[in-house]
Every structure is written in structure tokens, then in C-alpha cells.
Amino acid sequence: GLFGVLAKVASHVVPAIAEHFQA
């Protein structure tokens, strides 16, 4: 469902943001 898609997107977006803040 929509929540599954949202969770999948978040699981990609969150690490990307974390890399930007750590780099």
C-alpha cells in the first residue's frame, strides 16, 4: 500500500540525508 511505498522511500532518503550531514 501507500505506507509501504512511503517507508521504502524513507529508507532511501534518510541514509542519503545522513550522509550529507556526516560528510
UniProtKB/Swiss-Prot annotation:
GO biological process, one term: defense response to bacterium
UniProt main location, coarse: secreted
Residues carrying Alanine amide: 23
Keyword Secreted (UniProt): yes
GO CC term (a single one): extracellular region
Keywords: Amidation, Amphibian defense peptide, Antibiotic, Antimicrobial, Secreted
Location relative to the cell: Secreted
Summary of the tissues where the protein is detected: Expressed by the skin dorsal glands.
Keyword check for RNA-binding: no
Described purpose of this protein according to its UniProt entry: Shows antibacterial activity against S.aureus and S.uberis.
Protein name: Maculatin-1.2
